[in-house]
Regions:
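N-terminal Rossmann/SDR dinucleotide-binding element
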Residues: 1-125, 129-132, 139-143, 148-151, ...
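Conserved beta-loop-beta element that borders a ligand/cofactor-binding pocket
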Residues: 233-280, 284-294, 298-333, 385-392
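Glycine-rich "substrate-gating" loop/helix at the edge of Rossmann-like oxidoreductase active sites
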Residues: 290-294, 325-338, 358-370, 398-400
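Alpha-helical substrate-binding/gating segment
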Residues: 307-309, 342-357, 364-421
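Mid/C-terminal beta-alpha module of Rossmann-like enzyme folds, strongest
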Residues: 382-491, 499, 506-513, 517-520
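Non-catalytic pre-domain segments flanking phosphatase-related domains
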Residues: 537-581, 816, 820, 844-845
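C-terminal cap/substrate-recognition subdomain and adjoining C-terminal extension
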Residues: 563-568, 572-574, 650-651, 657-845
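Active-site neighborhood of HAD-like aspartate-dependent phosphohydrolases
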Residues: 569-624
Length: 845
């Protein structure tokens, strides 16, 4: 039979010394790389000097358990105090007392090898703190870790019991201390007692009596359902309809970035959709049964399954409320990762959360992490109850209530005195909250998301650059933040509206059993917390430090960051600097170069015809360019068919001096020369034609461009002899060049202006977005890439299309031909009508 609830009298004996009770013991800890687990391991090693600690860590393909323990636990700043106290002996002490065991709580048998089983068999106490702690964890992973994990740990202990009896015949059975959550009480109101749901169900008590969810659930069916949902969603995500949507969205985000990048983004969108659907499925199932989300739901069922499946084990259940930064140990404010409150606080301080649901008179039940770690250690030292599974709440709401309204007042006052600064260097004024219902806040944020999403789509579709593109990037960032704020309301709103009060009778009984000395070292009484001091002087300073928000005027910081990035880019240590041409070196493009060359020797009347034809085709040209830059260039360059190569090359010299030089960016030219002066190899990589860029060749060490073939009569065929390097081809060509020259792309720079240049920018260590269009501006802002805004040499007005000098006395080689009369016609541009023909060349007169 499972153990039943114990009485307070059963645990009334004094504990002379926690360190003494655990001396010589081996304590096996799961979840040691997490927030609570790291604090627990550090506290054991520092405050229980004669115990051994073993940690279960899942190996990765790159790192074994020992490497992860060293990197993710021992090197964490949580250990700074112990490192300072031990000095030079720190490494040897850690090596002698801390061991890492490879394994995984989501695997039956924990994935232990023989050595791992030996260590588990020797453990006197197992603290199971591993959990999928995110409130938005996918239902299948929450089931594997939170629901099945505790029972798997119990099964592994039982499986090792025979070995323990053989190897350690004088030792008592292993004591399992499992960390659950107080919020498995669900959405009930009133006092939630330290009782197992199975005991409440067995006694016939109603849910409202114990303020816990006592709904009977078929746990096996829930596990099967979660696994099946994953399988079903994975299958649906691969249907043609879904894949088309993901691909379309990827193209909208990245434009003509290239097949591989678009495929990667579409696959990421598919995976995100599966995950979001799993989260929603978990939330819906949990709320249908009385829990706010999959976290509380799976933790509750995991606790039930453990005590039902393993009645033979001595078990203590520790249920913390919301765990936050340390009150004092190892140092005030220590935190690892953001918990529940931090994202809400930072979003509020940024002015993003104008409202948040909650009951101002309600209790915000949070507890510092060091109090939880101390309570777990004390529970381990006290040992298990002789006849029952002991349950301990580690919560503050009853013992030392902290009202939600007061928390908001403290946060508002603190950020009024210490505001966060926005990107313009202006302090952000925090709003007043009126504590509306969750539904109202969600509707407000949903409307804001819709409006910002529309603005983002509109701006990204416009051909804007520079400051206007930066505006689009800011809108995208704002939309992303608003989307995140909505998710916070959906995730955490239920917790700020919780009216359950978690009693701590057994916790305080345990506290009263401690000696005065242990109460100093292992403090876990919530009554010691001064909430005003904790929020103002401990928690909020820690939150802003870890959030890395701007707490001073932003402009000097931004200027300093810009200068640091520029110094890194212009370091002599760099190897290569690659430059795009259009809107990076010159404010021009292949269409303008063609228009200038095509009209160079045309009389006035024919000029109007050719320009009108190009403008008429502009929408289809733009659509093709956005879809595939390579297809656009191949199609557009067919217009050069029949042109005399010698004449075009001669005219291209004029093009450079009359147009390109005027539209060049002096800062770009200076930057190329600066790189050359620093000894960097300079490369121009462009889809423009060789005769257009030929005058620029002296500026660069290498020019990689497109080239048209020539027939036996010296005329351009309109077909490419050397393909234009676009999309992924740019990255591949540059990588080949760097490899052949012994250059490291990780120590190289790339300058480009468009999202279609992403492969080029991503293949180097120092990407620079120059005069970026809207999509690239948003990407660069998100990734923290260096950005340059360069002005052209001539700032005068620009014509729609530039025209070559009027010279009707020389040869004219352009005319309109009927496509139907040509046997080898170039591919027609998508979207053009039969009468909208390409302008092609003919023999010179």
């Amino acid at each position: 039979m499972p153990r039943t609830a114990d009485t307070l009298a059963e645990i009334s004996g004094p504990i002379e010394s926690i360190a003494g009770a655990l001396a010589g013991k081996t304590i096996f800890v799961t979840g040691a790389t997490g927030f609570l687990g790291t604090a627990l391991v550090e506290r054991l090693l520092r405050s229980v000097p004669d115990c051994q600690v073993a940690v279960l860590i899942r190996p990765t393909r790159r790192s074994g358990a020992a490497d992860r323990a060293k990197r993710e636990i021992v090197r964490n700043d949580c250990f700074n105090r112990l490192r300072s106290e031990l000095g030079d002996s720190f490494d040897s002490v850690i090596e002698s007392r801390l061991s890492a065991v490879g394994g995984d709580v989501s695997t039956d048998g924990l994935g232990l090898d023989d050595e791992g089983q030996r260590i588990l068999a020797s453990a006197d106490v197992v603290v199971h703190s591993a959990a999928a702690v995110a409130f938005d964890a996918p239902i299948d992973s929450a089931v594997e870790v939170n629901l099945l994990g505790p029972s798997r740990v119990g099964a592994a202990i039982t499986a090792c019991s025979a070995r323990r009896e053989t190897d350690h015949p004088d030792k008592a059975p292993t004591h399992l201390v499992t960390v659950s959550t107080a919020y498995l009480a669900g959405t009930h109101m009133g006092h939630a007692t330290e009782i197992l749901a199975t005991d409440a169900m067995r006694s016939g008590a109603r849910a409202r009596t114990h303020t816990t969810v006592t709904t009977e659930v078929d746990i096996t069916a829930e596990v099967d359902s979660a696994r099946n949902i994953r399988s079903e969603l994975e299958s649906e995500s691969r249907t043609p309809t879904r894949l088309t949507r993901f691909t379309k969205k990827a193209r909208n985000e990245l434009g003509a970035a290239g097949t591989h990048l678009l495929a990667e983004r579409a696959e990421k969108l598919r995976q995100d959709w599966v995950r979001a659907s799993l989260v929603e499925a978990g939330r819906a199932r949990a709320q249908a049964l009385g829990w706010p989300d999959a976290y509380a739901f799976t933790k509750a069922l995991g606790e039930r399954l453990l005590v039902t499946n393993h009645p033979e084990l001595p078990i203590t259940v520790v249920r913390p409320s919301i765990i936050e930064s340390a009150l004092a140990e190892p140092h005030p404010g220590w935190i690892r990762g953001f918990r529940m409150a931090e994202p809400i606080i930072i979003s509020y301080a940024r002015g993003l959360l104008k409202e948040f649901p909650g009951i101002p008179e309600g209790v915000t039940d949070v507890v510092p992490v060091d109090l939880v770690a101390a309570a777990i250690i004390a529970a381990a030292a006290a040992g298990p109850s002789a006849s029952s599974t002991r349950v301990l709440h580690v919560a503050s709401g009853v013992r030392n209530p902290f009202r939600y309204g007061h928390l908001v007042e403290l946060v508002q006052a603190w950020f009024t005195e210490h505001p966060i600064y926005d990107s313009d260097g202006q302090p952000i004024m925090v709003p007043d909250w009126s504590f509306p219902g969750r539904g109202r806040v969600q509707r407000q944020l949903s409307r804001a998301n819709t409006a910002l999403g529309f603005a983002e789509r509109l701006l990204s579709a416009l051909p804007i650059r520079g400051d206007r593109a930066e505006l689009a990037a800011r809108v995208e960032e704002r939309r992303s933040l608003a989307e995140r704020a909505l998710s916070y309301v959906q995730l955490y709103g239920a917790y700020t509206e919780t009216e359950a009060l978690f009693t701590v009778d057994r916790l305080i009984e345990l506290w009263e059993r401690l000696s005065e000395a242990d109460r100093e070292v292992f403090c876990f009484d919530p009554a010691v917390i001064d909430w005003d001091d904790y929020v103002e002087n401990v928690h909020l300073p820690s939150v802003v430090e870890h959030a890395r928000v701007r707490m001073t005027s932003a402009r000097p910081a931004m200027e300093a960051r810009h200068d640091r990035a520029l110094r890194a880019i212009l370091s002599p240590d760099r190897h290569l600097a690659a430059f795009d041409l259009e809107n990076t070196i010159v404010a021009s493009n292949v269409v303008e170069s063609y228009a200038w060359l095509a009209t160079r020797h045309l009389p006035l009347g024919e000029r109007a015809t050719i320009i009108a034809r190009i403008l008429r085709e502009a929408p289809s040209l733009l659509a093709l360019d956005r879809r595939d830059r390579g297809d656009f260039l191949r199609s557009f360059y067919r217009r050069y068919e029949g042109a005399p190569e010698e004449l075009v090359r001669r005219d291209a010299e004029e093009l450079f001096h009359h147009l390109l030089l005027r539209r060049s960016f002096p800062a770009a030219v200076a930057r190329v020369r600066k790189h050359k002066a620093l000894g960097h190899r300079t490369v121009l990589i462009t889809g423009a034609l060789d005769f257009v860029v030929e005058p620029m060749r002296p500026l660069f060490d290498e020019v990689i461009c497109a080239k048209l073939a020539t027939d036996s009569n010296g005329r351009l065929t309109g077909r490419l002899e050397r393909l234009p390097p676009t999309g992924e081809a740019r990255a591949l060509v540059l990588a080949e060049y760097a490899s052949s020259e012994g250059l490291d792309l990780g120590q190289s720079i790339a300058y480009a202006d468009s999202a279609s240049d992403l492969p080029l920018l991503e293949c180097v260590g120092f990407p620079v977005a120059v005069n970026p269009e809207a999509k690239l501006a948003a990407i660069a802002r998100k990734r923290g890439w260096h950005t340059e805004e360069w002005e052209p040499a001539s700032t005068g007005s620009r014509s729609v299309l530039p025209l070559g000098p009027l010279d009707s006395g020389l040869s004219r080689w352009w005319e309109r031909l009927d496509m139907s009369q040509k046997t080898d016609s170039p591919r027609k541009i998508s979207g053009t009508s039969p009468g909208n023909r390409q302008v092609l060349g003919r023999k010179a007169r």
